[in-house]
């Protein structure tokens, strides 16, 4: 049973193509190393071997200008290259902890591996895009050769695709490519190879009716009965009218039987089709599961039965399987927010209507989970560790009746998708069979009946089929001739007497890399990946991860330490570095795992880049992203001051009024490393500043250089102005998937209820306020804070002229402290009370992440500022009586970093007494 003390979460994040298995990770990292080492890059990469990488490394090792550390790193890369099998295959084993450690070490080495900028300045590598280009070129060549009946050269092209190291990333494409090879082998009269390739196509896509058809044709001479079984399977699985008629004709023209073809169709429909059981068997796999064993027994028994016997015994076996399911319901109850491990699946069979298969949880790994719906079964399969640790999903797929797919919610998406996923999946479930005789009316894509009504619909269809049997039989001969003419493009091999020139589009992958949209590959991945050790890849795929942990708000407060707080800040900084904005960050979405590590979940309103809908895969880009968790320089000793985090955030103020923010991602030891050595151009942000600051490189020396207490407050405000000016840069940010596009005027209307005499009044329905009280000294509890239940006192209440809003100056009662808390409504607040001699400067950061806007609250002794961060501008912010320039929301993590840096620079240390007193007992 699932441990009730652990919390299991699933949330959605729509992403683009990503790498997912450990061999591909190493392959990717080696490409990065190769890119850094390559000084003669010509736009082409050899994707089949890395022999030239050894030569590059050897030339660098012999170069006296490189340090011993770099040479040692190069030898490490060379060892990895020589020891690892770099080409991903479908039979690789699940990576163990040793491989994970190796990959993490590899990342650290690459981050510290520096060469001259000239070595890589012209290198613009996009692995997936390059892969697509290569496959497209090979596919085009293969088609041209096929048109010219040059089958030998066409075979060479598709064999190159077959040998590609990326070939295991899409089983849909493997199945298609194998089918092409089978056709070409048959053209070259190589029967064994044709059989082998067509069988491989069947294996990689169990629902590929055409693969079954070709395989049946190829083995007809050697094994007639098996060939007929495969031809019949292709006939049953086909949903298109013309192809179905053709497959039916092929099958019954070869089978010696007195039963008419359409009578056979009627019997197959009465079975509800055994394909439902086949699908379930494929997804369950050969485990010790009771249901799986029952299905296997059924499959063994029906192997040598006639179709009539199969239909007769089907209901008995369905009853047996349902009885097993009823028994399992008493031992385990599945919910949409819980997973099971492999061991738990074996010991506790599951509900057939909610199959959730966590393929790797027994290894204690986090990774990708793919979910799909086949018939009445919702299938969730987890695959190896991905770069997107901490990002999870429950979105299901709903067919819209076209080639596009919509992403439903976790609450009702599964129910909506149970019947809709049938027409494209060829799964031959109840609703799909209803449509077999109705495709001319286009009913196959409008199957909105619930599963509870499928049996009734099947009975109705059976009656219709009975009534139409005679007519269908009378027209059978006519249809046979027509189907031959209409389906010339679907024939394939050997002694086929149809015109081979008309076979091109259906037989070969006609520009499939250009024409296949996201939906085609996505649904096939859900259907095909039935073996946990076989890992596929999708485009704009749904990503999930199982996270074992406890919500921050429910975590034992006595166990909260400074390390947890620091890890959270670092985690948020990493999100900022990779430009990911959470937009719904609160205590329930921050999990603390058993080992004390943090994981932030619920990225349901985040998005990376554009909202791509049905883009050709040649237009999609790769995203290589990971949280770099190796922070060797941070010592989490509780006595140490929390300031090492700024090894990764260097803030330099100089006399030239240029503010340089260097996110030092490529070195974890030297906070003052040369920013020019950073290969990431986005890591250096240079913007104008109005600061008249001291040229010293850090805020600490800057603040110490001011002795006049009367100017301290103004100086601190100027520093904050400089920091805010960094945020007014013209860059892309993440937007909610379902957010509407608002112009400035519409945004104003959304945030503010109305405009009265140049005053903006808040729209209470869309913009929550900070809690406040009119009575002086009345304590206010700012919600259930995860780290501190802080009582605050409202010192004053001032009305700020537009575009400011009513806010109150808040002061934490008690000692000087740095307080971090998260409000229930998704607001992050960092409150930094800082004493500088006799003056106070209270800084508060409060972005409202779940809306289209944010706001930055700045509280001082004399003035209060509430700056809407909902609009876009290229100007500077001025904290005076003039209206503050509005700008669009940026990642809230930056505000956190700036507030922390401000605190560090002005006070020379973090003030963390409450954490030590309350949490480190």
From Swiss-Prot:
Region described as Disordered: spans on this chain: 401-499, 664-711
Superkingdom field: Eukaryota
InterPro entries assigned to the protein according to its UniProt record, in alphabetical order: ABC1_dom (IPR004147), Kinase-like_dom_sf (IPR011009), Replication_Regulatory_Kinase (IPR051590), TPR-like_helical_dom_sf (IPR011990)
Low complexity biased stretches: 401-494
Pfam families according to UniProt: ABC1 (PF03109)
Annotated region described as Kinase-like, given as residue ranges: 334-628
Domain text: The kinase-like region is slightly similar to the kinase domain but does not correspond to a canonical kinase domain and is predicted to be catalytically inactive.
Protein name: Putative uncharacterized protein DDB_G0278921
Naturally occurring in which organism (per UniProt): Dictyostelium discoideum (Social amoeba)
């Amino acid at each position: 049973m699932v441990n009730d003390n652990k919390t299991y979460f699933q949330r959605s994040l729509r992403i683009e193509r990503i790498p997912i298995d450990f061999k591909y990770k190493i392959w990717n990292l080696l490409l990065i190393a190769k890119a850094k080492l390559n000084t003669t890059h010509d736009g082409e990469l050899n994707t089949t071997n890395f022999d030239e990488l050894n030569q590059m490394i050897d030339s660098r090792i012999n170069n006296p200008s490189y340090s011993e550390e770099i040479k040692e790193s190069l030898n490490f890369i060379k060892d990895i290259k020589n020891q690892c099998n770099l080409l991903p295959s479908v039979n690789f084993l699940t990576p163990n902890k040793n491989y994970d450690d190796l990959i993490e070490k590899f990342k650290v080495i690459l981050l510290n591996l520096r060469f001259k900028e000239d070595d890589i300045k012209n290198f613009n590598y996009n692995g997936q895009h390059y892969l697509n280009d290569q496959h497209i070129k090979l596919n085009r060549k293969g088609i041209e050769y096929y048109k010219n009946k040059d089958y030998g050269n066409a075979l060479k092209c598709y064999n190159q695709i077959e040998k590609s190291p990326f070939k295991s990333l899409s089983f849909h494409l493997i199945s298609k490519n194998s089918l092409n090879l089978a056709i070409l082998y048959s053209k070259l009269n190589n029967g064994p190879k044709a059989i082998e390739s067509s069988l491989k196509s069947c294996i990689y896509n169990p629902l590929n009716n055409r693969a079954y058809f070709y395989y049946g044709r190829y083995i007809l001479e050697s094994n007639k009965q098996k060939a007929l079984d495969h031809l019949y399977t292709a006939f049953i699985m086909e949903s298109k009218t013309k192809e179905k008629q053709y497959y039916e004709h092929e099958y019954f023209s070869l089978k010696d039987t007195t039963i008419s073809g359409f009578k056979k169709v009627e019997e197959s429909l009465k079975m509800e089709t055994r394909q439902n059981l086949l699908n379930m068997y494929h997804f369950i796999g050969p485990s010790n599961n009771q249901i799986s064993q029952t299905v296997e027994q059924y499959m063994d028994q029906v192997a040598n039965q006639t179709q009539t016997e199969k239909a007769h015994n089907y209901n008995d076996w369905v009853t047996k399987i349902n009885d097993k399911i009823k028994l399992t319901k008493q031992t385990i109850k599945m919910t949409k927010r819980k997973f099971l491990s492999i061991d738990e699946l074996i010991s506790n069979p599951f509900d057939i209507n909610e199959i959730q298969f966590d393929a790797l949880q027994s290894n204690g790994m986090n990774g990708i989970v793919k979910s799909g719906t086949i018939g009445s079964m919702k299938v969730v399969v987890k695959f190896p560790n991905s770069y997107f640790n901490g990002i999870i999903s429950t979105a299901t797929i709903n067919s819209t009746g076209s080639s596009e797919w919509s992403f439903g919610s976790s609450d009702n998406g599964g129910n909506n998708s149970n019947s809709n996923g049938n027409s494209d999946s060829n799964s031959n479930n109840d609703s799909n069979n209803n449509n077999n005789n109705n495709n001319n009316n286009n009913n196959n894509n409008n199957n909105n009946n619930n599963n509870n009504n499928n049996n009734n619909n099947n009975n109705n269809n059976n009656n219709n089929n009975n009534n139409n049997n005679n007519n269908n039989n009378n027209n059978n001969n006519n249809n046979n001739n027509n189907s031959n003419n209409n389906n010339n493009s679907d024939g394939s091999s050997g002694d086929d007497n149809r015109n081979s020139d008309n076979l091109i589009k259906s037989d070969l992958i006609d520009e499939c890399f250009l024409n296949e949209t996201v939906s085609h590959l996505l649904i096939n991945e859900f259907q095909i990946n039935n073996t946990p050790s076989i890992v596929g890849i999708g485009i704009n795929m749904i990503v999930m991860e199982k996270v074992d942990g406890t919500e921050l708000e429910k975590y034992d407060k006595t166990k909260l330490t400074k390390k947890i707080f620091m890890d959270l800040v670092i985690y948020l900084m990493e999100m900022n570095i990779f430009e990911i904005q959470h937009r719904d960050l609160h205590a329930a979405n921050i999990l603390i795992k058993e080992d004390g590590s943090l994981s932030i979940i619920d990225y349901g309103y985040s998005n990376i880049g554009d909202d791509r809908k049905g883009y050709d895969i040649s237009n999609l880009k790769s995203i290589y992203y990971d949280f770099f968790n190796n922070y060797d320089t941070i010592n989490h000793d509780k006595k140490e001051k929390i300031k090492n985090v700024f090894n990764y955030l260097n803030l330099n103020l100089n006399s030239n009024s240029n503010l340089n923010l260097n996110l030092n991602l490529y070195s974890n030891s030297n906070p003052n490393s040369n920013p020019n050595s950073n290969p990431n151009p986005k890591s250096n942000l240079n913007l104008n500043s109005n600061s008249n600051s001291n040229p010293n490189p850090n805020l600490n020396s800057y603040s110490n250089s001011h002795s006049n207490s009367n100017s301290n407050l103004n100086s601190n405000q100027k520093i904050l102005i400089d920091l805010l000016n960094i945020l007014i840069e013209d860059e892309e940010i993440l937007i909610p998937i379902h957010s509407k596009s608002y112009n400035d005027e519409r945004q104003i209307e959304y945030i503010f209820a109305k405009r009265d005499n140049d005053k903006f009044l808040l729209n209470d329905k869309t913009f929550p306020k900070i809690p406040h009280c009119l009575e002086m000294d009345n304590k206010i509890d700012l919600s259930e804070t995860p780290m501190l239940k802080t009582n605050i006192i409202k010192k004053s209440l001032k009305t700020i002229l537009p575009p400011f809003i009513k806010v109150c100056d808040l002061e934490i009662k008690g000692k000087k402290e740095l307080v971090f808390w998260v409000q229930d409504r998704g607001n992050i607040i960092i409150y930094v009370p800082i004493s500088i001699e006799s003056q106070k400067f209270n800084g508060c950061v409060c972005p409202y992440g779940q809306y289209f806007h944010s706001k930055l609250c700045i509280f001082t002794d004399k003035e209060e500022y509430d700056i809407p961060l909902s609009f876009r501008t290229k100007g500077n912010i001025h904290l005076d009586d003039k209206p503050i320039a509005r700008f669009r929301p940026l990642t809230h993590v930056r505000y956190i970093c700036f507030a922390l840096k401000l605190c560090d620079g002005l006070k020379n240390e973090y003030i963390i007494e409450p954490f030590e007193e309350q949490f480190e007992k």
